[in-house]
Amino acid sequence: MEKQMNQQILKDTIKQLFANGKGLLAMDESTGTCNKRFAAAGIPQTIEMRRKYRELIVTTPGLNESIGGAILYDETIRQLTADGTPMAAALVKAGIIPGIKVDTGARQMAGFSGEKITEGLDGLRERLAEYKTMGARFAKWRAVITIAANTPTIASIKANVHALSRYAALCQEAGIVPIVEPEVLMTGDHTIQRCYDVTELVLKTLFYQLYQFDIDLEGMILKPNMVIAGTESATKNTVDEVAEATVKCLLTSVPAIVPAIAFLSGGQSPENAAAHLNAINKNFKDRLPWIVSFSFARAIQQPALDVWKGEETNVAQAQKLLYTRAKSDAAARRGEYNTAMEQKK
């Protein structure tokens, strides 16, 4: 009975997250990653500056028109806005569902040079219970798969999807929707076909493992990479080629009963990420059995971060850019994005 109740809660949460053409905002950068981005923008790397930046995001007027849920980091969910409101409560007030990143990062996999395994399962049941009391209704765990001459190995793929499945089981037990993120990195000189082959292998291995762990596929969200050539590849593919390869790979690998796919941007420029998502939804609308949306971080945040620069006087302009960027991605989810939207900034 309790399992059935949880299943309904999970379905309802997913429905709300993606209602009215919305997507997800990933603002779950670890302290190290956030500091790196601050350093590049010339912003002091302090806990207070990180708090101010996160407040800038969660208090952006009208953000809930395009964003149904925001993924927080442990530091963020414990922080308050200037008026003393917890960040998660500020999101709820803005009409956005709070989520939480629960993995503790990818570490070098012993015995497998250049490959990583994501950690964070120890004590996860207790952490999920705490995050739930703090308002989190969904969670995220990211696995990292690297393409190189001799990678990925089947050992690293299996280890990572095993961890993703254990995480998903603990989330569903807690009534929290798991975002399952197996990211095949864009880094490298590989072709789009190589990315396709690796992504297909990863997804098929993942869903077999999720099946073995009795994961309720209707109560999860898949956050995959798009099928795209490596950043150093000699061949650059067209927007339509990326859309076609991505859709074909997903149709081959992802069960139709999964309710939603929310793409990661993976370091693509904001414009490219939107154009690819748009082509997927526009060109293949009649063939997609899932909601196909976004869960972008840099592809939404970067323009705002570049303008903010840590200055109070730039907050309104930065929020305007954040709002516009999210609007563009929501349009791409509907297959209605065009580059002219970028000029309206």
Each language-model region and where it sits:
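Alpha/beta catalytic barrel-like cores
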Residues: 2-134, 147, 235, 239, ...
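Conserved, mostly hydrophobic/aromatic
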Residues: 46, 141, 180, 222, ...
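Hydrophobic residues within beta-strands of alpha/beta enzymes
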Residues: 70, 139, 178-179, 220, ...
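Residues that line or immediately flank small-molecule/substrate-binding pockets and catalytic motifs
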Residues: 74, 143, 224
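Proline-centered loop/turn at the N-terminus of a beta-strand
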Residues: 97, 177, 219-221, 260
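Short, histidine-centered active-site or binding-site loop motifs used for metal coordination
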Residues: 104, 145, 184, 226-228
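Helix-rich catalytic cores of soluble enzyme domains
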Residues: 124-212
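Catalytic core of soluble alpha/beta enzymes
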Residues: 186, 190-257
